[in-house]
Amino acid sequence: MTVLLFTLIVLVGAFLAGLLGSLTGLGGGVIIIPLLNLGLGVDIHYAIGASIISVIATSSGSAAAYVKEGITNVRIGMFLEIATTASAIVGVIIATYIKADYIVVIFGLILLFSAVMMLRKKVDHSNNEQTSVLANYFKLNGSYPTEDGVKQYAVHRVLGGFAMMFVAGTLSGLLGIGSGALKVIGMDNIMRIPFKVSTTTSNFMIGVTAAASALVYLHKGQIDPMIAMPVTIGVITGATLGAKILIKTKTDKLKVVFAIVVTFLALQMIYNGLSGKA
């Protein structure tokens, strides 16, 4: 395969990954890494390195818009980033010492989990209940704009959410994905933050977490510009288009189809990892 053909395939694949990732809320990494590893035979470490760069780029663009709209809770994001940034570096170090086959299997399992999370019914936790002591101490409670005016919300179980962020950060560094599903669980289910706030705050955090991982991958020489550049351009373009389509389109059926595709990719990666074909 020529360099030009490889670049074109990666560019088109990354565009579709960014488009579908934006429409379904999973991000492009869950598609682009299997494409590079399974489809094009790229070493899993280099596939992860390219994905991390694209995660930084896409998160930075959309995060700025959400912060400007006043939906993102920047204070919660920066507080939880203490856990995710430190653990992301731990994840990258772990990736150095375990076989690529194991990384592929873990990635497949996370894909399965993400597919289930994508179909999960969303619950809004907007509330004015009594908050936790730590939330008051760190001033994490907040508000966000809605069609019915500004809604106040209280933050709960701060330590539980912080612990979940450590797990999410480790997986982000290990696998090169945003681990948005785990971050949303930490903020939505554990800390009981409204879903819209948890998703936008997660998006804000993903770029910072990925940046910490990228520094280590760059130091190890596992970020190849020939792969990372078309991946980043494709994912950003696809994600931008997906965001515009999302406003006008119902994505329930698309999410079901995408969950099936992701499940297939997950099983394929798990099989390859267990059989030593990764």
Q: Which positions does each model-derived feature cover?
A:
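Generic transmembrane alpha-helix signature in multi-pass membrane proteins
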Residues: 60-71, 171-172, 183-188, 208-223
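Juxtamembrane transmembrane-helix boundary motif
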Residues: 1-17, 38, 44, 68-169, ...
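Membrane-embedded alpha-helical segments of transport systems
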Residues: 53-61, 83-87, 94, 205-212
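Short hydrophobic/aromatic, small-residue-rich stretches within specific transmembrane helices
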Residues: 51-55, 202-206, 227-232
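Transmembrane alpha-helix interface/packing and boundary motifs in multi-pass membrane proteins
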Residues: 14-25, 62, 165-175
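Alpha-helical transmembrane segments of multi-pass membrane proteins
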Residues: 9-14, 47-53, 198, 204
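Interfacial segments of multi-pass membrane proteins
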Residues: 32-46, 172-173, 182-197
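Juxtamembrane transmembrane-helix termini in multi-pass membrane transport proteins
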Residues: 24-82
